[in-house]
Amino acid sequence: MTNYAIILAAGKGTRMTSDLPKVLHKVSGLTMLEHVFRSVKAISPEKAVTVIGHKSEKVRAVLADQSAFVHQTEQLGTGHAVMMAETQLEGLEGHTLVIAGDTPLITGESLKSLIDFHVNHKNVATILTATAQDPFGYGRIVRNKDGEVIKIVEQKDANEYEQQLKEINTGTYVFDNKRLFEALKCITTNNAQGEYYLTDVVAIFRANKEKVGAYILRDFNESLGVNDRVALATAETVMRQRITQKHMVNGVTFQNPETVYIESDVEIAPDVLIEGNVTLKGRTHIGSGTVLTNGTYIVDSEIGQGSIITNSMIESSVLAAGVTVGPYAHLRPGTTLGREVHIGNFVEVKGSHIGEKTKAGHLTYIGNAQVGSSVNVGAGTITVNYDGQNKYETVIGDHAFIGSNSTLIAPLEVGDNALTAAGSTISKTVPADSIVIGRSRQVTKEGYAKRLAHHPSRSK
């Protein structure tokens, strides 16, 4: 059995009120088009053809070499859109899935079941349908007394009886590929919209006494077509619930799943505890036994097992096992932390490697640095890495002790086991095993404070 797919992605999406093509709006971190394409891959299509139109280059860039593309210059209806794929698929033996690119909730399992139903029942066309409590706006499935599908009627063309029907057309179909393009040559624009309706091929097949079937979705949510921001928010809510449920089934604990935002490509190992208001985005991986506390935000990062991240932001960073971060820390892109590193309150690290068991507990900036293992970085330490034009590296050796309020002016190297005195400004190489003091000598003037206007003795 050879399968093909046609994805309809040419529309502007006027009701979205956006410069962005409708299918490129995102749901849980992926464009709607990407969600649809991933589900389509469940049927293993020999060829996928995406129909593009409005801002076509942006749409094409999302799927790139994963799909063939055809251009629909004028949007003259769904039938016209499918006609555009004729140059790619006409005459081929097999079954063709037709699906809209704005249906991000459809699952691969449902599409696979649709194809299987179509093949097993030897249909020339199979419609994916759903039962709607409020069917207004949807095309209705009209059956005869024997339950056979005889036609699909659009809302604007439906009579009073047809408008009461609750079985609706989801806009997803499977056709015998050859018969699809033969039937498309017979449809017209004689309808309320003045468009070429893809649904009109059903009546053509029925007139030829060819078999048309309908496969009913179990979950109505999968039928959602996103046409405005309200529907986009609905899709986001459903997708977020799916994602959290998937992770819970796989052994992840959520204290308040309704408040968590996790994107589609995030991976979470078992025995992770996630508190409320946590955001995980992009290609993030969370290792087993990790705890993410309230307010944590992580994007495109790897967190090693057994780590504790407390109310902190982590971007494009890699953390080894047993790391503790926060509260209120910020790990910026290019940061790597070795095993059992501690990054504490109000510490910012950017583009740096921190060796295992090193600690930077408070109020510190580490940028463009290579920090060894078992280093203590005192409170208020700053790596001065930027001169207004270029950035420079700071290298700190193993077991070094950086005193509080040290200012390290790069390029700079502090050797193994070296110590910088608190309050020092260091601008030259510090040899291994050295102590360096880079501050002014303290001067004490006894009794001098009594001369100052604010001294209590002057207010008498």
Swiss-Prot record:
Sequence positions that bind Mg(2+) = D102, N227
Q: Where does UDP-N-acetyl-alpha-D-glucosamine bind?
A: 8-11, 22, 72, 77-78, 139, 154, 169, 227, 332, 350, 365, 376
Requisite cofactors = Mg(2+)
Region feature (Linker) = 230-250
**CDD domains referenced in this protein's UniProt entry, alphabetically:** GT2_GlmU_N_bac, LbH_GlmU_C
Q: What is its EC number?
A: 2.7.7.23, 2.3.1.157
Q: GO annotations under biological process?
A: cell morphogenesis; cell wall organization; lipid A biosynthetic process; peptidoglycan biosynthetic process; regulation of cell shape; UDP-N-acetylglucosamine biosynthetic process
What is known about what this protein does? Answer: Catalyzes the last two sequential reactions in the de novo biosynthetic pathway for UDP-N-acetylglucosamine (UDP-GlcNAc). The C-terminal domain catalyzes the transfer of acetyl group from acetyl coenzyme A to glucosamine-1-phosphate (GlcN-1-P) to produce N-acetylglucosamine-1-phosphate (GlcNAc-1-P), which is converted into UDP-GlcNAc by the transfer of uridine 5-monophosphate (from uridine 5-triphosphate), a reaction catalyzed by the N-terminal domain.
Q: What is this protein called?
A: Bifunctional protein GlmU
Origin species, per record, is Streptococcus pyogenes serotype M12 (strain MGAS9429)
The record's gene field reads glmU
